[in-house]
């Protein structure tokens, strides 16, 4: 009699097994759901990373979606040349050819209507082409660290012939280069390596930061973007503040925040291509007066990496996963995101007791 297992005991054992199985299934499901928060100061490349996820994991932009970016490409191109011309006045740079002053006046007369209508009329394209070819305009462009200018300025202006054609349809690369300030929170979903990603792109300008906080709960990992090339620039919203210093301040507050004790922090030192071009003629001491190394890519980039990683106050328990990126280079982002995903899988399984 004592050795007989009662029906109640059998049922209880079965219930227990089901609960264990459900818990394990829930754990595995939780391990497959990834909430990624993209953080960083304004213009650090967060939105470009989101666009790359669409290209890499969601079959990219359709022809119709690319067409919808046409007006943004035109606006970015017009705004860029206008910013350079305005800066010439402030920096007291003359046109190489004095007749370009008439073109500048015409630019400002035509620009407003063109932007409102999302078009690039032939007369405006010709004006921009002549201005961009001027030696004085090029001299001002080479001093762009002294004023606010889109990173994509040269990309669009050098390709004006193609962009201004009547049958122009933006390419994926054109779309990647577009700049639209992110306001609020943009959510993207995709699946990769059997993981279901929810990626949140959050506006980086100071006025946007108060909107971040309610996104923080249950975050798997934070990708923090830094524009390496911003070491010699000031903020658009505060011309006294160096952009790299602002980025470091923000990273410090995120990395050492009690909310993120168990959150993987992935650091994207972005715009490495622009940094490599710039470091040769614009010394790192502009940002870090104590720097004594060479103004060469490897040494200077390594120094910036150590400055950010040294902000981590929990080095013994928290690792920062750093990658050098070029957000407009699809192959580079694909390679880096593959490595990031492997880290997330490992850490997720560990958290769920499955590793």
UniProtKB/Swiss-Prot annotation:
<keyword id="KW-0342">GTP-binding</keyword>
<dbReference type="GO" id="GO:0036064">
    <property type="term" value="C:ciliary basal body"/>
</dbReference>
<keyword id="KW-1003">Cell membrane</keyword>
<comment type="function">
    <text>Guanine nucleotide-binding proteins (G proteins) are involved as modulators or transducers in various transmembrane signaling systems. The G(i) proteins are involved in hormonal regulation of adenylate cyclase: they inhibit the cyclase in response to beta-adrenergic stimuli. May play a role in cell division.</text>
</comment>
<feature type="lipid moiety-binding region" description="N-myristoyl glycine">
    <location>
        <position position="2"/>
    </location>
</feature>
<feature type="region of interest" description="G4 motif">
    <location>
        <begin position="266"/>
        <end position="273"/>
    </location>
</feature>
<keyword id="KW-0131">Cell cycle</keyword>
<dbReference type="GO" id="GO:0005813">
    <property type="term" value="C:centrosome"/>
</dbReference>
<keyword id="KW-0206">Cytoskeleton</keyword>
<feature type="region of interest" description="G5 motif">
    <location>
        <begin position="325"/>
        <end position="330"/>
    </location>
</feature>
<feature type="region of interest" description="G2 motif">
    <location>
        <begin position="174"/>
        <end position="182"/>
    </location>
</feature>
<dbReference type="InterPro" id="IPR027417">
    <property type="entry name" value="P-loop_NTPase"/>
</dbReference>
<keyword id="KW-0449">Lipoprotein</keyword>
<keyword id="KW-0479">Metal-binding</keyword>
<comment type="similarity">
    <text>Belongs to the G-alpha family. G(i/o/t/z) subfamily.</text>
</comment>
<feature type="binding site">
    <location>
        <begin position="270"/>
        <end position="273"/>
    </location>
    <ligand>
        <name>GTP</name>
    </ligand>
</feature>
<keyword id="KW-0472">Membrane</keyword>
<keyword id="KW-0547">Nucleotide-binding</keyword>
<dbReference type="GO" id="GO:0003924">
    <property type="term" value="F:GTPase activity"/>
</dbReference>
<dbReference type="Pfam" id="PF00503">
    <property type="entry name" value="G-alpha"/>
</dbReference>
<dbReference type="GO" id="GO:0005834">
    <property type="term" value="C:heterotrimeric G-protein complex"/>
</dbReference>
<dbReference type="InterPro" id="IPR001408">
    <property type="entry name" value="Gprotein_alpha_I"/>
</dbReference>
<feature type="binding site">
    <location>
        <begin position="201"/>
        <end position="205"/>
    </location>
    <ligand>
        <name>GTP</name>
    </ligand>
</feature>
<keyword id="KW-0807">Transducer</keyword>
<dbReference type="GO" id="GO:0007193">
    <property type="term" value="P:adenylate cyclase-inhibiting G protein-coupled receptor signaling pathway"/>
</dbReference>
<feature type="binding site">
    <location>
        <position position="47"/>
    </location>
    <ligand>
        <name>Mg(2+)</name>
    </ligand>
</feature>
<feature type="region of interest" description="G3 motif">
    <location>
        <begin position="197"/>
        <end position="206"/>
    </location>
</feature>
<keyword id="KW-0519">Myristate</keyword>
<keyword id="KW-0460">Magnesium</keyword>
<feature type="binding site">
    <location>
        <position position="182"/>
    </location>
    <ligand>
        <name>Mg(2+)</name>
    </ligand>
</feature>
<dbReference type="GO" id="GO:0030496">
    <property type="term" value="C:midbody"/>
</dbReference>
<dbReference type="GO" id="GO:0005737">
    <property type="term" value="C:cytoplasm"/>
</dbReference>
<feature type="binding site">
    <location>
        <position position="327"/>
    </location>
    <ligand>
        <name>GTP</name>
    </ligand>
</feature>
<dbReference type="GO" id="GO:0005654">
    <property type="term" value="C:nucleoplasm"/>
</dbReference>
<feature type="lipid moiety-binding region" description="S-palmitoyl cysteine">
    <location>
        <position position="3"/>
    </location>
</feature>
<comment type="subunit">
    <text>G proteins are composed of 3 units; alpha, beta and gamma. The alpha chain contains the guanine nucleotide binding site.</text>
</comment>
<keyword id="KW-0132">Cell division</keyword>
<dbReference type="InterPro" id="IPR011025">
    <property type="entry name" value="GproteinA_insert"/>
</dbReference>
<dbReference type="GO" id="GO:0007214">
    <property type="term" value="P:gamma-aminobutyric acid signaling pathway"/>
</dbReference>
<dbReference type="GO" id="GO:0031683">
    <property type="term" value="F:G-protein beta/gamma-subunit complex binding"/>
</dbReference>
<keyword id="KW-0963">Cytoplasm</keyword>
<dbReference type="GO" id="GO:0005886">
    <property type="term" value="C:plasma membrane"/>
</dbReference>
């Amino acid at each position: 009699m004592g050795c007989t297992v009662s029906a109640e005991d059998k049922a209880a054992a079965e219930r227990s097994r089901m609960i264990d199985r459900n818990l394990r299934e829930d754990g595995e499901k939780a391990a497959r759901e990834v909430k990624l928060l993209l953080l960083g100061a304004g213009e650090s490349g967060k939105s470009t990373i989101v666009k790359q996820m669409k290209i890499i994991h969601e079959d990219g932009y359709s022809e119709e979606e690319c067409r919808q970016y046409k007006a943004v490409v035109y606006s970015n191109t017009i705004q860029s040349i206008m910013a350079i011309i305005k800066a010439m006045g402030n920096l007291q740079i003359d046109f190489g050819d004095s007749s370009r002053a008439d073109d500048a006046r015409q630019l400002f007369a035509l620009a407003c209507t063109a932007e409102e209508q999302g078009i690039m009329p032939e007369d405006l394209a010709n004006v921009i082409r002549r201005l961009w070819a001027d030696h004085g305009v090029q001299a001002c462009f080479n001093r762009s660290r002294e004023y606010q200018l889109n990173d994509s300025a040269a990309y669009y202006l050098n390709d004006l012939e193609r962009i201004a054609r009547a049958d122009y349809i933006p390419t994926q690369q054109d779309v990647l280069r577009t700049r639209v300030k992110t306001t609020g929170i943009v959510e993207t979903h995709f699946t990769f390596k059997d993981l279901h990603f929810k990626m949140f792109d959050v506006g980086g300008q100071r006025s946007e930061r108060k909107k971040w906080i309610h996104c923080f709960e249950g975050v798997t990992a934070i990708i923090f973007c830094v524009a390496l090339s911003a070491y010699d620039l000031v903020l658009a919203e505060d011309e006294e503040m160096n952009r790299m210093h602002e980025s470091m301040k923000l990273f410090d507050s995120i990395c050492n925040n009690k909310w993120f004790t168990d959150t993987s922090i992935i650091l994207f030192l972005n715009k490495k291509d622009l940094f490599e071009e710039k470091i040769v003629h614009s010394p790192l001491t502009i940002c870090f007066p104590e720097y004594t190394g060479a103004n060469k890519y490897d040494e200077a980039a390594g120094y910036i990496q150590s400055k950010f990683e040294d902000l981590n106050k929990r080095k013994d328990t928290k690792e920062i996963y750093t990658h050098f990126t070029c957000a407009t280079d699809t192959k580079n982002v694909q390679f880096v995101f593959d490595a990031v995903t492997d880290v997330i899988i490992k850490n997720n399984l560990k958290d769920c007791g499955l590793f």
